[in-house]
Every structure is written in structure tokens, then in C-alpha cells.
Amino acid sequence: MSAAFVTIRSAARRRLQDLRDALTTIPDGRTWRTCGLIYGLFLICAFPVGLLSGLVRANPAALTRNELVGSGLLLFVHPALAEEIVFRGLLLPRDSRSWPRRRLLLVAGAALAVYVASHPINALLFRPQVVGLFESSPYLALTTLLGLTCTATYLISRSIWPSVAIHWLTVVTWLWLLGGKALLR
């Protein structure tokens, strides 16, 4: 067995162990409050971008209770949980303090870049009718801000759940209340 294979295998095991730990860690109240503060900072930055670009506007979607429950569950699984597992849980170290700062910034920056790039790529592959939206500078700026927020809360909490909650809350609020559903038609 080559040394490279052993290194890759041990790195993969470490990533999976980090993910398992991140999925089973529930932050304490103080950590949730810190993550809430970070989310508040995200909202302060994101709303002006969204309003000025027209990506955010008061336009509640007409949804039945069953549609709310169904779409809420679906949006929890994807994009919130699935994307946070991939782009935070698998790509980022759970214990960021054990990594040299430069390496952590490089890995976090690369994970963020892949996260942002995945949105227009997914649109090209699965929803070509919204490629223009997903490639627009304001949308990519908001995606970057959300990715930064989720990265920060993951690294602070060492848990996947604050970033999943933030991701889910942001997506459902945009789709259900702030015109996102209309923009995706």
C-alpha cells in the first residue's frame, strides 16, 4: 500500500469523523446566541444588496399549509442540510484551532469558492431557466455572504446545526416572503 493512499484514506476518515461529530454536537445557548448575532450581521449586510438589486422585495408566496410543510421539509434537506454537510461538514475542519491560520483561511476560502460556484453550475444542470439569476452579481454576492456566515457559525460552534438553521431560514424567508419564488419561475 502506497504512502499516498494511506494519507488519502486517513484524511477521508478524519473528514468523516469530523462530520459525524458535527452532526451529533448540539451547541449550548451561548453559542447559539453568538451564531444568532453573526446571522444578524449577515442580514444587515444582505438586505441592502437584495433590496437594491430587486432580489429581495415583499412578495409573499401564496402557499397552502401542505405546501408550506412539504416545501419547508424539502428545503431543510436540500439545500440547507445537504449543502452544509458538503461545504462545511466535509470540507472544513471541525476543530479550527488545531489548524495553522493560513491553512485554515486557504481551505475555508476554497470551500467558499466551491460553494458559490456550485449555484450557477446547479442552475445550468438542473434549472436552466434560472441561470441568469444564479449567475447575476447580486445573487452571487448574497450567496457569498451566506456562505461566509455559515462558515463562521460552523467554525465557532463546531456543529453543523447553526449553519443548517441559518441556511434554511434564509432560503425559506426569501422564497416564501421576499419574492424568491416568483424569481425562480
Annotate each language-model stretch with its function.
Residues 2-3:
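N-terminal signal-anchor/start-transfer transmembrane helix
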Residues 7-11, 18, 23-24, 53-62, ...:
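Juxtamembrane/disordered regions of integral membrane proteins
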Residues 47-54, 68-185:
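Transmembrane helix-loop-helix hairpins at the membrane interface
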